[in-house]
């Protein structure tokens, strides 16, 4: 099977780190900045950064509606930190009118673990990730305040969900691209491959 084509939204955040991790995990990965590139992708990563800034840039580059349509159409998407916020249905402590892509049936709390001075690292057991605990880096991170029935919680910190999955959508509060451990990215690549197999089976 050929490598799945996975784009990393290159407006802000740890774009190169995500691209490198995806390539190591077996994907044909590259940067994405234009709506027209979405149709060429088998999957997409929304990296961390500042969620309100990214939301504004999505409007500036006319990406918001195409991304909403892509998610609604079943494109597998992995959002880390700010990416989790963008995939949420609603945000607590967000800016008024903050643009969201949606698709993931969760309500998240922005900066739930505190501002940058209160960022931290910890080891997590993540369902679907084999081997030892995942070393997770949290930077002004959100958590999931409320999850719908169709959302699978993959990991928690202090009983708060920090990694979730709903069908082809995956989201983490933490930054797996910063540690050199590619297992979360490998999980997403496996999700993309599975969706490709289902799509081929339907065609």
UniProtKB/Swiss-Prot annotation:
Listed EC numbers: 4.3.3.6, 3.5.1.2
Active site per database record: 81, 175, 177
Pathway(s) it belongs to: Cofactor biosynthesis; pyridoxal 5'-phosphate biosynthesis
Keywords tagged on the record: Glutamine amidotransferase, Hydrolase, Lyase, Pyridoxal phosphate
Binding sites annotated in the UniProt record for L-glutamine: 49-51, 110, 139-140
Pfam family, one: SNO
Record-level Gene Ontology MF annotations: glutaminase activity; pyridoxal 5'-phosphate synthase (glutamine hydrolysing) activity
GO cellular component, one term: glutaminase complex
GO biological process: glutamine catabolic process; pyridoxal phosphate biosynthetic process; pyridoxine metabolic process
InterPro entries reported in the protein's UniProt record: Class_I_gatase-like, PdxT/SNO, PdxT/SNO_CS
Top-level division of the source organism's lineage: Bacteria
Catalytic activity field: aldehydo-D-ribose 5-phosphate + D-glyceraldehyde 3-phosphate + L-glutamine = pyridoxal 5'-phosphate + L-glutamate + phosphate + 3 H2O + H(+); L-glutamine + H2O = L-glutamate + NH4(+)
Protein family (similarity comment): Belongs to the glutaminase PdxT/SNO family.
PANTHER family membership: PYRIDOXAL 5'-PHOSPHATE SYNTHASE SUBUNIT SNO (PTHR31559), PYRIDOXAL 5'-PHOSPHATE SYNTHASE SUBUNIT SNO1-RELATED (PTHR31559:SF0)
Subunit structure, as described in the record: In the presence of PdxS, forms a dodecamer of heterodimers. Only shows activity in the heterodimer.
Primary role: Catalyzes the hydrolysis of glutamine to glutamate and ammonia as part of the biosynthesis of pyridoxal 5'-phosphate. The resulting ammonia molecule is channeled to the active site of PdxS.
Name by which UniProt lists this protein: Pyridoxal 5'-phosphate synthase subunit PdxT
Species, as recorded: Parafrankia sp. (strain EAN1pec)
């Amino acid at each position: 099977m050929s490598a799945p084509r996975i784009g990393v939204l290159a407006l802000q955040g740890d774009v190169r780190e995500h691209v490198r991790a995806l390539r190591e995990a077996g994907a044909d990965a590259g940067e994405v900045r234009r709506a027209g590139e979405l149709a060429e992708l088998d999957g997409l990563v929304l990296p961390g950064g500042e969620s309100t800034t990214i939301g504004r840039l999505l409007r500036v580059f006319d990406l918001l509606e195409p991304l909403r349509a892509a998610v609604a159409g079943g494109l597998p998407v992995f959002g880390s930190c700010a990416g989790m916020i963008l995939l949420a249905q609603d945000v607590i402590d967000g800016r008024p009118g903050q643009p969201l892509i949606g698709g993931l049936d969760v309500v998240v709390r922005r900066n739930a673990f505190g501002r940058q001075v209160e960022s931290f690292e910890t080891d997590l057991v993540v369902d679907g990730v084999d081997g030892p605990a995942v070393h997770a880096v949290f930077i002004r991170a959100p958590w999931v305040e409320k999850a719908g029935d169709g959302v699978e919680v993959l990991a928690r910190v202090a009983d708060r969900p920090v990694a979730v999955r709903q069908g082809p959508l995956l989201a983490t509060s933490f930054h797996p691209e910063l540690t050199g451990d590619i297992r979360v990215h490998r999980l997403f690549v496996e999700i993309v491959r599975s969706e490709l197999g289902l799509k081929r089976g339907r065609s």
